[in-house]
Design a protein with these regions (language model features):
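Beta-strand-centric surfaces of beta-sandwich/beta-rich domains
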Residues: 1-164
Length: 164
């Protein structure tokens, strides 16, 4: 199994309503499996606040109701073990979609890491066997979105996941 770190830095989130298409740079990012047989297991989600004044922000990790299309960019997706063999189809990560931006589902929220981005942090770790999975190429199972629902906090952070 290959483990990856999907990262972003200095993203100022925009408060985007559910079932509304994102635009470039409005969210930390979108993690898309990209293949019917590729499964991602999310082990950790970390957000670190970078604002210079108090800014409570309600972040959401949710499934997509409309999946992104095209290459994802503006974000880093790095193999954490240099000796691991990367799968043939590597999942995509980024905050900008080449063709169609995703839409966050209004009913499939997974995590809600709300915190003050004036130096605050939010960290979620899965227990073994309780990882969040992303698999396939369809909405609701093939992609998750980390984004703000309320507030405009500036963050950097990462999502650790493994691919099987």
């Amino acid at each position: 199994m290959a483990r990856y770190s999907a990262t972003w830095s200095s993203i100022t989130a925009a408060a985007v309503a559910d079932t509304t298409a994102f635009t470039a740079g409005q969210a930390p990012g979108f993690l898309r499996s990209g293949n019917a047989t590729v499964q991602c297991k999310i082990n950790e989600v970390y957000l670190g606040g970078m604002d210079s004044a108090s800014n409570p922000t309600e972040f959401i990790l949710a499934r997509s109701s409309t999946i992104s299309v095209g290459t994802l960019s503006v974000g880093n997706n790095a193999l954490t073990d240099v000796n691991a063999q990367a799968p043939t189809n590597v999942p995509s990560w980024g905050s900008t979609a080449a063709t169609t931006f995703p839409q966050r589902s209004s009913t499939l929220y997974i995590l809600e890491p709300t915190f003050n981005t004036f130096g605050g942090i939010s960290r979620w770790q899965a227990r073994i066997g309780e990882e969040i999975t992303v698999q396939g190429t369809t909405a609701t199972s093939g992609e998750v979105i980390l984004s703000a629902k309320n507030g405009t906090g500036k963050t950097s952070g990462h999502i650790y996941y493994e691919v099987s």
